[in-house]
Amino acid sequence: MLSPPPPTEPRPAQSGSVMAVVSASILAVTDDPEVKDLLLEMALADGFGVRCAASEAEAAKLLHRERPGLLLVDLDMAGRAGMKFLRTLRQSLFRDIACVAVTASNDPMLSVAVDAPVFYKPGLDGLDTAIGRLFAPSR
């Protein structure tokens, strides 16, 4: 799914690329409207640009258009799509993008399984602080 884009589309930021990394932007990937609203509210309140994708395919298209500074991925998407998306991402051109996962599960091993910090719904306590820390050097 996260294969290189066709030659007619811009490629993700690489040395010599004209496509810039939008350092204070976030791509939120979730199919849950409540989680989407909460993530949007948190990110916008802290002054971050945010784009949302409701599926792995939509997220891949957005990644090829604009490289975000951070991905927020809902692991509880239908068909475990969030987990699959993060695993695929880690093996693609986008593996260097910072990722944070959100889930309703309280399994402490999820962070290890997805190689990303995991925050728990519904409150997502501490997520806004973590996002602020991730972007602190570039702001």
What are these regions (language model features)?
Residues 30, 73, 101-105:
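Short beta-strand/turn micro-motifs composed of small residues
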Residues 64-66, 89-96:
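Conserved phosphotransfer cores of two-component systems
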Residues 73-90:
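Conserved phosphotransfer microenvironments
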